[in-house]
Structures are given as structure tokens and as C-alpha cells.
Design a protein with these regions (language model features):
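Domain-terminus/edge residues, biased toward the C-terminal soluble/receptor-binding domains
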Residues: 1-209
């Protein structure tokens, strides 16, 4: 439950603006000043840490939910039931260190990436249309796994005009070794309308020559 709540909170950047503060000051209406210190020591002593919260009770003992972001990847470490305060921070630090050393966020594809190939168009104002990816894909992978990735594109032999930009015309399968791990739409990069009257007339003449 703590992990699920932490992951949801991490989606809201405003939270990290406050949770990442190590020291802050409150000025009361009376003018009295209260100094605040973040109980999450990792905010100060762990690079990239910007949340979340500590807690302790007699039953739960010392606990912490900590998060850090590096190289575009955010990790969350939840530690419960430690015998003393420092151990919860040590355990959380070890978990974060392991995660950042072992995994990486990889941008496999970006929306709008051109495929470098075209698809034949029947009875259109152009004979073919360029293709691009209709969506992007980022994944968390173990370090070194990128060499096992490949993308296979499945397309029909041709499509009929009219074709509109963004129209789905095929599928790109992302494979890790031989296992499909994701599917992306392949879309038309531009419009291919039906030929106009004059162009259509000349095409008919060409067919009869």
C-alpha cells in the first residue's frame, strides 16, 4: 500500500517541490518563526532524492518511503520494521543504489519516428506513402539488455486511396530476443487523396494505350 501510494504521489511534480526541501522556515502571523527540518535524511545525503516520508510506531518500528530520480528514471524504495532510524535509511539507500546500477530507462521508439520505408497505394494521387510510428515506447530494462531488442514491422502489400495522415496501416512488434513485449501502430506520414478528375482521366487513357 505504501508503494502504491508513493508511486501515485510521484506523478504530481508539485509534491516534490516541497518534499525535496531539507530545511524550511514558517513565519506565523504573530511574527514567531518556526524552523522545520525534513525527517527524511536521504533528501540531503542521497543524490537525486526528493521524497517521500518517514514514520515510526511501536508496532511498525522505523519506516521510510524514499524516492530518487536519475537519468530520467525514478525509483521508489519502501523500508518497514527497522530497529533503529539509521538502518531504514541505509536499507533504502542500498535498494536505490541497486536499482540505478542494475536498470535503465530506455527510449525504444518515439512517436513520429520515420521508418525509412513506404507502402504502395492503389488508385491514389501518389503511388506510395511514407510510414512512421504512431506512438512512442519507453521501458525499464536491465543494463545491457538493449542488444536483445529488435523491431519487426508487419504491413499489407498495399492499401487503397484515399489515405489520411495518421491512418493506421500496420503494426510494429518490439521483441526481446524472440518474445513480443510491445506492439506499436504504424501510420501513414501524409495524405494520399484520390486523383482529381483530370488526373483520373489521363490515367484511364494510359490504361488503354
Amino acid at each position: 500500500d505504501v508503494m502504491m501510494l508513493s508511486c501515485e504521489v510521484s506523478r504530481h511534480p508539485t509534491y516534490h517541490t516541497y518534499a525535496s526541501k531539507w530545511l524550511d522556515t514558517l513565519v506565523h502571523p504573530s511574527g514567531r518563526v518556526t524552523d522545520l527540518t525534513n525527517t527524511n535524511r536521504l533528501v540531503r545525503f542521497y543524490d537525486g532524492c526528493d521524497g517521500f516520508k518517514t514514520g515510526s510506531t511501536d508496532a511498525a518500528k522505523f519506516c521510510v518511503s524514499a524516492t530518487a530520480q536519475k537519468n530520467g528514471m525514478r525509483l521508489v524504495a519502501v523500508v518497514l520494521g527497522c530497529e533503529n532510524s539509521q538502518r531504514r535509511f541505509n536499507e533504502a539507500r542500498s535498494m536505490l543504489d541497486y536499482g540505478f546500477a542494475t536498470y535503465q530507462r530506455v527510449e525504444i521508439a518515439r512517436k513520429g519516428d520515420m521508418l525509412g520505408e513506404s507502402l504502395a497505394v492503389q488508385r491514389g494521387s501518389a503511388d506510395s506513402v511514407e510510414l512512421m510510428l504512431g506512438s512512442g515506447l519507453s521501458m525499464l530494462l536491465r543494463t545491457g539488455q538493449t542488444s536483445d531488442l529488435r523491431i519487426e514491422v508487419s504491413l499489407p502489400e498495399s492499401i487503397d486511396a484515399p489515405v489520411t495522415a495518421g491512418q493506421i496501416v500496420g503494426i510494429a512488434r518490439v521483441l526481446m530476443k524472440d518474445q513480443v513485449i510491445a506492439k506499436l501502430n504504424v501510420v501513414a506520414a501524409g495524405d494520399v487523396p484520390l486523383p482529381g478528375f483530370i488526373e483520373g482521366f489521363y490515367r484511364i487513357l494510359d490504361m488503354w494505350r
